[in-house]
Amino acid sequence: MRKILTFAPILCFCLIQCLNKSESRFPVDLVLELKNAKSKFKIGTDNRTYHWKKNPGRQSGLPLSRKWENTQITFNTNKEIFLNHSLDAIYFPPGQEYQFTLPKGKYKFSSLVGLLGEKEFQPSVSGKLKLYTQSQILEEWDFTGAAKEQWNKKETLVTLEGDLRLVWESKDSDLYIGEPLLYPWEWLDTLVSAQKPKSVILIVIDSARKDFIGAYGFRHSVTPNIDQMAKESVFFENPFANGNWTKPSMMSFFHSEYSSNLGLGNSWFSTKPYQRKVYYGKKRDNLAKTFREAGYYSKTIMNNVFFLDYTTVGLDLGFHNSYQVGMDIVDTEILTNHAIEFVTEKKDIPYFLHFNLNTPHASYSPPPEDMKVVRSIIPDSEFFRYESPVQRYLGEMHYTDREIGRLVRKLKELGTYDETMIIVTGDHGELFSPEHDYSYHFIMQTRFGHGETHYDEEINVPYFIKLPKSIVYNIGKNSQIRISGQSSLLSLAPTILGFLDLLPKNSTYQGVDYASCIRNSTPCPKETYIYTEGRMSESVRTENYKYIRRYPGFTTVRRTSAGEPHTMAEELYDLKQDPKELRNLSLGTEGEILLQQARADFRNENFLKRNGLRIWIPPCEETVCRDFMSMSVQGSVYDWVAPPTVQIASGSAKTISVTKESKDRKGSNASSQEPKQDLSEEIILRTVNPELGAFFQFTRNGKTIPVRFGKYGLEFQKSMTHIEDLIVSERQPDGLYASPLPWVYNDGAFSGSGESEVQKEMGKEVKKILETWGYIHE
């Protein structure tokens, strides 16, 4: 059997996958088994608020009454480099026990264990962790005198008789068992005796422009290691990010869905409570979660905080282990060293590693030795044509490539390179052209930065996939496989999972699975429209044109930060005639036909899901009615639909004013019978942010009048600022068009009302009560 496996890599891979599927889950991830385990104490609240670097685990499926039993907790294990080491852990307050029902057999128990005191300034921590099966003690670890906020590796071999009980004996100390995994001995033996497992490394280079990489046509060999790997890969010739800065881009390619459609918006760093509610409240497939559920060990090594939930910036995607270095400049070598340690330690098991290097990102501070190499590669006559920041950027790209080369050499030394899938991409590019220097509203200037524009130099990134040799052999390709035409990073997750036969059925991944067409030697689908989000802006790119749109309230731009402001709500570029995007055709009549086509394509594709604030303005019952309404939303205004009789002006990203003048309409709707829907009296204000609440004030002929809200038409004399629970109605409220007062409701088309069937039934009773109290007037 071992000889067959040695010479049959495809058979071996299938066997490993079959073992994973037939034996419940191998390795056994105790965090994911928590929901079926018995716990001595249910822990539904945060017992240690003084240690704020933590959050309840988001992937274990625990009920609210037990949610803190799984804690994603971070220890600052090296304060000099701001090293935040976060693990998905099982939480043990003093005296806590957990009992798991598991298949009988021999296992390797593996974990990282950390301690905290019950009190913040407690001088010492201590306790004993005991492992039992059927009342028989398997292992005991004494933590007397252990250091706080440090991770300690604990492994042991155990033979289970159908259960595993973990007992924490302590008077005043908390225990966190991070990444607790049980590896079946037979499964490990299969991996050792057969070929190396197929592991996956996703290398994300922050701010990597495609056109500064040799594989994409840069004339000088600044990135030799990346270029060599590209020759062995599925190579996307013209790939684009779906976000022009890190957060919306990485969230989109990890989930194969646009950031705003995940509930996260695109405007700023923070992730607000309601955005978290929408994100965590729906089924969300992502790379870390899918690999973990398939039995892979999952880790991120990075210098950004977007995968750390406690920061209020990031989210918990379900990694076993997150290693984040916050110190800039020195971080790259530290992260690479840790990645080398990781691939060495985990060489015998399948893993998914997200390796994120921040190096090319500003402030462009390459080591002198890398600048020296770049100077030797590029002739002076060409090198000095670049401005100083671009020269340093080239040094950073060489430094990044050098570090990636170190990791690749270690994989080859370990004998794991051939069967490791390696993906190289960038989260976005970087803007260098002075012609594109528009500064808008945020903390960084546009030039030598990103996040403000949608020109190709800011969103055109490298993207290629080095396949395991056994997969290459299976599909009969021995050289680079090129994907022509434009593509997007929305395809990244379904494509790499497709090659590994791990794409879940009925998944939420939206992008193209290129693995299918490559394996079947059929023409690959064309990504006709590529949509990209920016801060309060968006774009759609085809092979022929680029259309850019800014949200209302964000249409004023400046040429350089000190320049004169001017309005530029739209941009349009003919990419066939103007590939450098220098002539904005939206400003004159020359591009009118193309502009109408681009707008229509943009509307018809419906890239984003949106909530609709629906506003009913009642008919005028006086000789003349001058209606005015001021309104602000918690997120940002995306667009609106209004009849010609209504004038709308935006005061900022979050506020608009509505003005309507009408003459007497007495008799037109005088019947007690409710008329058909009259769109001429309805305004729809759309938002992509998931927050439902808003602020309104309505006057008719200078007099403030009450407004009705939500499904019940609750009437308020004064404007309100927090009406989330009252304003939502997933259908048109009863009596809307017969109302003599303005009526506002949020259709929750994106966020949803979040009501259960029980809550809906309760709502009927609430409506009756409110009617008897006089709050609802049909």
Language model regions located:
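Signature aromatic-anchored transmembrane alpha helix within multi-pass, membrane-resident enzymes
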Residues: 10-11, 496
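Non-catalytic, glycine-rich low-complexity segments
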Residues: 83-94
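Catalytic domains that recognize anionic headgroups
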Residues: 18-77, 92-103, 107-110, 114-128, ...
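Sec-dependent signal peptide recognition
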Residues: 2-10
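Generic recognition of well-ordered secondary-structure surfaces with a strong bias
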Residues: 1-2, 111
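Hydrophobic core
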Residues: 13-17
